[in-house]
């Protein structure tokens, strides 16, 4: 009877796997494939014959390497200061480092322009100088500050996982603190450093909000593809440019999976160790403290100046305080309402699909579970601009015409954030024994009852955590929806971009502050809710 019940569970897994595969094909592989094969040969040849596009490709790759490197170094210093040195106010510094993750990605660009632009508070009012923040230097600084928290969180986890006995053993053998760091700590940090560099590099390549605002004449593939669609509606050229953008991001993604998957940096043996870590080298402790405090002050300055800009009469000319920018946000209520509505439904799509995929992968009762795992994580390598353009091409005709509707936005957000929700679902499902489900089935429970009464309640923490984080990402998303919004389906982030392009800095700053406030409220609400069931939210 027990084995009979085991067999009764399998068809449900096959059904779940088939449904998940159909959704992945229709709303992920199909749009991606259409963009790759959309351009006609003459159209592709016309685009590729223009050296300007390859210059933009080179610029994008170079910026990924440059910003990825500086963000990783900054993240390492920040993580070392908080985890190993444990500087004063570490909790506050950690919270400050999360702000760029929670805020819309273009917020730092707006703040940099308010500070260092042609009418900037520092450049014009304080220093009486003309400094052109637009271009590759401004973009490099902005993307470093925007994405260094990704490196910080990755490296902080790696530093916490390194046991003190390894470094203490080297110290007991006579190695200096600097030698211990160079020969023991740094090699153990290598997988984290590579992961950080690749993660930030992918994020920089896929970034759209910062380049479109602050890159100026420094051509980047995302901005050129955007201009080709919005300015000329040249889908041939936009598809080629988006495909050029996809290539390096997928390469970095595959390197990350293969390189980190094949290397073993085992530091935990059968015996646990409570030995403390030896003191950090003096020079590094001082440098890490200076870097971390400087970065934190700069982040606070960035968001402080954004708040100041939201209550200034006319930035660059009249700095007297006013609330008119906030009172004028009444006409943005439909955009804010749509943002909350679509973001919530998109998070539901992400969580449900991620849970289904994690279920069939961890239970391994289907063919090629590794294939499902790969396609559940591959959206992390797809720039949002590329996926959004794919949806425009794929769903602009019968029998599945979705353009101009809210459904296309919800589905795009849901599929784009699938890897985030999948990570939480996999981490929790891997810890749940299959014997619980089999025991319930053996007692007569139907497959649906097994999932609803056993599996799902045990996954509450993962569902809430994945839903909270994907909800946050949806609220502040710009790239994936830029081609999908219409006058009937406006969203707040695209409104901010329109305000920036129109020079309405006060309105743009006030709407950005509202979005940041919504993101913080969602985060704190999610943390409280998850703690209520006895778990913690890990970003």
Question: What are the roles of these predicted feature ranges?
Answer:
Residues 10-42, 51-160, 188-209, 238-258, ...:
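Membrane-water interface segments at the C-terminal ends of transmembrane alpha-helices
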Residues 1-11:
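Short, Lys/Arg-rich, polar N-terminal cytosolic tail immediately upstream
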Residues 114, 207-232, 318, 478-505, ...:
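Glycine-rich helix-loop "coupling/hinge" segments at transmembrane-helix boundaries
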Residues 166, 264-277, 436, 529-539:
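Short cytosolic juxtamembrane segments of multi-pass membrane proteins
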Residues 49, 85, 160-163, 168-189, ...:
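Short helix-to-coil transition segments within interhelical loops
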């Amino acid at each position: 009877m027990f084995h009979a019940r085991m067999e009764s569970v399998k068809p449900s897994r096959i059904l779940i796997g088939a449904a998940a595969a159909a959704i992945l094909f229709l709303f992920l592989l199909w749009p991606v494939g259409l963009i790759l094969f959309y351009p006609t040969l003459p159209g592709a040849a016309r685009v590729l014959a223009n050296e300007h596009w390859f210059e933009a490709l080179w610029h994008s790759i170079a910026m990924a390497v440059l910003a990825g490197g500086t963000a990783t170094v900054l993240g390492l210093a920040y993580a070392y200061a908080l985890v190993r040195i444990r500087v004063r106010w570490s909790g506050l510094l950690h919270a400050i480092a999360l702000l760029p993750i929670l805020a819309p990605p273009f917020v730092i660009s707006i703040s940099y322009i308010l500070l260092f632009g042609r009418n900037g508070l520092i450049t014009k009012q304080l220093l009486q100088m003309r400094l052109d923040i637009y271009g590759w230097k401004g973009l490099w600084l902005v993307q470093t500050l925007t994405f260094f928290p990704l490196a910080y969180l990755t490296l902080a986890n790696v530093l916490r996982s390194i046991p003190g006995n390894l470094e203490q053993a080297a110290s007991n053998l006579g190695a200096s603190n600097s030698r211990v760091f160079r020969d023991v700590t740094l090699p153990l940090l290598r997988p984290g450093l590579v992961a950080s560099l690749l993660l930030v590099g992918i994020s920089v390549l896929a970034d759209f909000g910062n380049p479109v605002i602050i890159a100026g004449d420094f051509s980047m593939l995302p901005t050129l593809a955007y201009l080709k669609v919005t300015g000329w509606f040249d889908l041939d050229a936009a598809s080629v440019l988006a495909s050029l953008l996809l290539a390096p991001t997928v390469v970095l993604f595959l390197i990350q999976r293969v390189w980190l998957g094949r290397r073993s940096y085992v530091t935990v043996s059968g015996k646990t160790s409570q030995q403390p870590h030896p003191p950090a080298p003096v020079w590094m402790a001082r440098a890490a403290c200076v870097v971390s405090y400087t970065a934190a002050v700069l982040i606070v300055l960035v968001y402080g100046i954004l708040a100041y800009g939201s209550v200034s009469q006319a930035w660059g000319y009249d700095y007297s305080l006013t609330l008119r920018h906030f009172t004028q946000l009444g006409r943005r209520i439909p955009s804010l309402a749509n943002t909350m509505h679509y973001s919530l439904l998109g998070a539901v799509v992400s969580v449900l699909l991620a849970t289904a995929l994690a279920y069939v992968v961890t239970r391994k009762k289907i063919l090629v579970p590794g294939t499902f795992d790969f396609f559940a994580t591959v959206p992390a390598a797809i720039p949002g601009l590329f996926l959004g353009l794919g949806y425009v091409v794929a769903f602009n005709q019968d029998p599945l015409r979705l353009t101009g509707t809210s459904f296309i936005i919800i589905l795009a957000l849901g599929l784009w954030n699938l890897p985030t929700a999948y990570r939480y679902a996999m981490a929790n499902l891997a810890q749940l024994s299959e014997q619980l489900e089999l025991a319930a089935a053996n007692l007569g429970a139907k497959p649906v009852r097994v999932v609803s009464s056993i599996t799902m309640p045990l996954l509450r923490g993962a569902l809430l955590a994945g839903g909270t984080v994907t909800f946050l990402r949806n609220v502040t998303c710009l790239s994936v929806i830029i081609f999908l919004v219409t006058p009937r389906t406006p969203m707040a982030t695209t409104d901010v971009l329109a305000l920036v392009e129109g020079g309405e800095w006060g309105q743009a700053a006030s709407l950005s502050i509202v979005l940041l406030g919504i993101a913080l409220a969602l985060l704190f609400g999610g943390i409280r809710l998850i703690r209520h069931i006895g778990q913690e939210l890990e970003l």
